[in-house]
Amino acid sequence: MRYEAGAEEEFEAACGLLVDRLVRWAGGQGTPVDAFMAEAALDYRHRATVDGRLGLWEPRHVEELLLHWFPQQVTEFPGEEPGDGPGTLRTLLRFLHAVRLADPRGPALDGSLGAVDAAEEWYPEAMADRDRWGLAKFWAVTAAEQGVDVMDGAALQRFAERAQRGEVAYDQRALDEIMDRRLKGRVPVDGARAEPQLPVVLPSDSELRRPAEASTTVAQLRSLAEWAGREGRLVTAAGRLRMADARELVDVLGTGDRTEGVRSSNDLPRLGLLVEWAKKARLVRVAKGRLYAVAKARPVLADPLQLWSRAFDALFELRQALIGARSGWHVESMLFDVYDEMLEDVLNTLYSLPCPMPWPRLRDSVHLSYRAHFQLDAGSDLRQRMWFEHADRDLRAMFDVLVDMGAVEREQGMADPAFLETDLSDAEDFGPELPAGLPQELTELLGVMGAAADPAEARERDRRLREELTAGPVELIRLTELGTRAVRQRLLAVGRDAPLVGELVQAAPAGLLGALAEEYDPDTARTELAGWISARRDRAAALRQLTDAVRTMAGAAFRTRAQAMLDVLAVAWPDGEGERLLRALRDDAVLAPLALSALAQRDLLSPEDMTDAEHLLVLAESLLQLVELAGGPGGAGEALRAQGPEARDAVAAALDSAHPDRAGLEELRHLAARAWGTSAVRHGGVRGRGRSTGRGGRKRRR
């Protein structure tokens, strides 16, 4: 489960529904739950994590929620009963697994619960630690401690005015720490979300060892370590290779450096890069005046894929060796100042793209990022052109290294039309809101633009770019399979979602269909589903498991998710038999409303072909899903009224249908009664701006 960072209404509705269902489930289990804390936990995953997956809770998420987000965001006033953050999180985790909303790529339930146990010991101390509080929470509690009624807006305003005049006592040290943490980015914050990635297809590691072994860089680094050996080679007092050894090594490694007339190994750039690379990859080290092979690196040197991967990660530390100034007479380019960040963004841009990136588009996108990072207005047009050309040469050098090691491949060809559809001429005028339709991950390069450029100049740049892309073949850049694997590993390491076709082969049916519905395009969904079915051998049994998963999800009162699961099953079912599957479910006691809705949405079933009873089933299903999309009971009344006066008759007709979700229809009846001002028994309704769950006045403060 994931909602886009800007889709606040959709998230709020989904959060309301989840909390409503959670409280009902917990009540049935006899398990206490704090609805406000549960809402705050979901807020954390949506707003403050890079992937935003509500159903995936790794130990790092558990720890950050309990020891950082709750202390920062959840305000508990003096005399108020504290909320049970760890207990609520345990209940939420059990609920997600029980109703099959847990992400199949996350840890097992026991692993997540163990992380809660580990953090719980420190939770009370963290909640009381003012250094961890948010700024608004700090002042709210300070006001409450001094007798201010924080629910009285006027009283709180008077307190704020006194604080500004220096008439309020407060913990200056704690406030300084809070401000320092905010300024240095050491707090979980809103807006941490990164763009989702498309699923990728990769060979097995055993297959990838062959291209890794063929990598020029792997061969050179291995040879360098073997040359250094266990006995080591003498180096100068500055830690550099002696010139005689450097000449020998140039020949051994085939670096192509010209040694004639060179007096220092420092003047052999390609050799210097490889030596520094081997150091950063922990393959060699300098100690006591000698260059040694690292003994612990022997297993890495023996495995080409491990060696290649270590070299790839070390590349992010090679800024000076790769593009640094060679002497005091030279200066670094703009790329030097943002090297590691730009390398990451460029690779993320190339990752999972369905077609190769044209060099001119990538180059100009990087230029936009430079404009965001640097004040370029002071330079003349000629000087700016020189700055960009210098940075372009360094970017080329970076790509040369990526090509040599086998992470990137280049070819000549026509740019895909997708790269002609996005007008970047006004990109510098955009703030955090970037233009829609950018190639996936290209937003990472653009970031937040700086001051607006001359619109005419920007349009002229875009015109020149289009001419360049359409005039003929251009250089096209894409990641190799090795490069894709390496970038994916880095994405996963920082918590980003990077789906891999085949990774769901052991997933439970509900987890499989949920992931396919949310993250996979039709082609990769078909491939993933085919692999899942193949692993079970019995196709008929596999279909029963999948349809049972949809049936269970519908029974758990998550009908919109059940609909999405059935839809993706129909689209991805092998041999194009999805329509036959839906028609077979037309008479299913539980799934008929979902199947009929799917057939109707695809224009595979006309209104004339449906019976009166089926019309009522589809009508009832649409209303039940409307209630869910509105956030459950909390927002459904307004949603029903928004449908207009004919909605009364529609609800009345739906209530007379044979829809299998009788509990849902009963809830719909009560919601409709409240929506149109008649008396009814209230059911559910735990989330909302007015609370009835004993949250004790706790507020989120940002």
Label every PLM stretch briefly.
Residues M1-Y44, A48-T49, A295-N348, P354:
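Hydrophobic, helix-prone linear segments
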Residues D20-M127:
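N-terminal core-binding DNA-recognition domain of tyrosine recombinases/integrases
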Residues R100-Q164:
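Extended, non-catalytic subsegments within catalytic or DNA/protein-binding/adaptor domains
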Residues F138-V141, E145, D152-R181, V651-S657, ...:
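Charge-dense, extended regions
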Residues A212, M414-G578, A589-G685:
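Long, compositionally biased intrinsically disordered terminal regions
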